[in-house]
Amino acid sequence: MAFHGGDIETAAEQTGRTQWLDFSANISPLGVPGSVKQAIVQAAEHLSHYPDPYQRKLRRALAETHRVLPEQIVCGNGGADIIFRTLRCLRPHRALLPVPCFSEYEEALTEAGCRVIRWYLPEPFQITRSVCEALENGCYDCLVLCNPNNPTGSVIEPELLESILETAKQKQMFVLMDECFYDMTEDLEEQNSCIRKIDAFPNLLVVRSLTKRYAIPGLRLGYGICGDVRRIEHIRTTGQPWPVNTLAAEAACAVLNDKAYQMQFREFLQQARPDLQRGLTQLGFQVWDSHANFLFFRAKGMSHLDLDLQEFGILLRHCDTYPGLNADYYRAAVRLPEENAKLLSGLKSCLSAGACGGAQCLKGEV
């Protein structure tokens, strides 16, 4: 199993501490929407019945949200479930995987019997036209991308993305595009989402998730959108017959219409992310611009920063488990202002104490 953030149970077992301020998982700190809680209470009345194996109500709601056909949508037990089921039924032979990226892509490809060719992106870990050249010169039948990227938060330029999709289409190559962080901020226009391109590129499948933006990772709800309805049906029939439980389906329908929470989250992130980025930069860290609800930064020579922060009850995502990254890189979720202040205070204490190998990078007050 791949390593992930948000594993507070393991942290508790290893340290004996039960209370954590978790910056390792990219979950909305605003908490579970009231609309979800209400939907779950109402849906509990139907738990004596099997869930709809076709998720008809949910797919209609998603289709209306994204302006696609319900037949172009497949729902699952989180975004990872869609990724695994898609690759399991596709069975690609040779995939190009730009790294660093979400670890489950390689795990899903490997499980599907595919040979994975890692394309190591040099710092600043940005997709460039070299990927198009690799596709043209290599022998691949699958390409996996994430936009925005996890863990960097960077995005692919729209013109370049179009070129990549055109190249893949010409080479008859399947493209799996993970957009699970795409709807986090207003700076990414929905018309540039790959969802708008599924009819022009039937070899493209876009993965989305409701987990992070609405703080419901425990419910597990993800979906894939593809212009090829036969492929969607193939994916739907791969795996168990009830991939989405009743509570998750009703909760998803509720949040899709919860405009107040959506606005509240975007307003929060619009203010909190630059504030946290500014604070990290003032401490001397190299911080990447992000289009998601997390920040990727480099703490040169500080390979135990995550462990040092545990003394303050703070969990930070160490990125040394991502292919292409070493022990200098970390990822921090954007949380509430008072929580972000605790992270910055903890980092400052670590730096002042020389807890990270004596690194001298403290530049200013936070």
Predicted region positions:
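PLP-dependent enzyme catalytic core of the Aspartate aminotransferase-like
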Residues: E159, E311-F312, T321-V366
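N-terminal "arm"/small-domain region of PLP-dependent enzymes with the aminotransferase-like
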Residues: M1-H49, C139
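Conserved PLP-binding catalytic core of the aspartate aminotransferase-like
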Residues: L269-Q270, Q282-F312
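PLP-dependent aminotransferase-like
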Residues: M1, R88-L145
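Short beta-strands and strand-loop turn motifs
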Residues: D22, R118-W119, C142-N149, V175-E179, ...
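Short loop-beta-helix segment that forms the pyridoxal 5′-phosphate
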Residues: P51, A63-R85
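Active-site pre-lysine segment of PLP-dependent enzymes
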Residues: Q126-C139, P151-V175, E179-R213
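PLP-dependent aminotransferase class I/II
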Residues: V32-P33, Y54, N203-W288
